[in-house]
Swiss-Prot record:
Protein name: Anthranilate phosphoribosyltransferase
Family the entry assigns: Belongs to the anthranilate phosphoribosyltransferase family.
GN (gene name): trpD
Alphabetic keyword roster: Amino-acid biosynthesis, Aromatic amino acid biosynthesis, Glycosyltransferase, Magnesium, Metal-binding, Transferase, Tryptophan biosynthesis
Top-level taxonomic group: Bacteria
Known function: Catalyzes the transfer of the phosphoribosyl group of 5-phosphorylribose-1-pyrophosphate (PRPP) to anthranilate to yield N-(5'-phosphoribosyl)-anthranilate (PRA).
E.C. designation(s): 2.4.2.18
GO biological process: L-tryptophan biosynthetic process
Amino acid sequence: MQPILEKLYRAESMSQQESQQLFSAIVRGELEPSQLAA
């Protein structure tokens, strides 16, 4: 998950699969609020 978050922080494009993984992790509550706030 960390590489996907780093892409997000750098405003880089993500693949559809990466976006799905990120969204699923958010929905399941697997990310800390501090990770989402950046």
